[in-house]
Amino acid sequence: MINQIDIKTRERMEACIQTFHNNINNIKTGRASPTLLHNIYIEYFGSKTPLRQVSNIIVEDSHTLKINVFDDSITSLIRKSILNSNLDLNPVLQGKDIIIPIPRLTEERRKQLIKVIRGDAESSRIQIRNIRRDANDKVKRLLKDKIISEDNEHTSQSKIQIMTNEYIKKIDCILEKKEKELMKF
């Protein structure tokens, strides 16, 4: 029973880390990366299709992305989707390809982005702590129902705390890496 709580807690904490990682990966650092466009979808044959399924996204240089579109008829749809994506990108049609220059970040914008990612990191830490609280409550309920002993309760809560510290440390590492990436350029 306790093992199931530990496994479920680890899964939930891992999902929280993954969500945080995905969120900050979508933040532009002033450097070209295909992941910038991973959340772009276009209407293709009546359904929303990810951009990466209808094209190749290539990094031309550190400040330019190039999109090789498989079907010429959707080039303008892709351009429109990128313009409407709130990514502040200005795609340029060049034959059947789309060129996307990535603007350099100003110092002020970098500081704003760092505040945003620090806020996301704190929200993720709070989620991890809430997951810990939920797990500890389940363990206490098992003790109250006399399914486990007090020793098992203390051992389980120690494991949960170690797990919590581990995942908060992961959040801090991801945050530190992203801050360095933002300040590099």
Curated annotation (Swiss-Prot):
Keyword Protein biosynthesis assigned: yes
UniProt keyword annotation of tRNA processing present: no
GO molecular function, one term: ribosomal large subunit binding
Matches recorded under SUPFAM superfamilies: Ribosome recycling factor, RRF
Pfam family, one: RRF
GO cellular component: cytosol
GO biological process: cytoplasmic translational termination
Location in the cell: Cytoplasm
Family recorded in the similarity comment: Belongs to the RRF family.
HAMAP family assigned to the protein according to its UniProt record, in alphabetical order: RRF
PANTHER family: MITOCHONDRIAL RIBOSOME RECYCLING FACTOR PSEUDO 1, RIBOSOME RECYCLING FACTOR
Function: Responsible for the release of ribosomes from messenger RNA at the termination of protein biosynthesis. May increase the efficiency of translation by recycling ribosomes from one round of translation to another.
This protein's name: Ribosome-recycling factor
Organism: Buchnera aphidicola subsp. Acyrthosiphon pisum (strain Tuc7)
Top-level taxonomy: Bacteria, Pseudomonadati, Pseudomonadota, Gammaproteobacteria, Enterobacterales
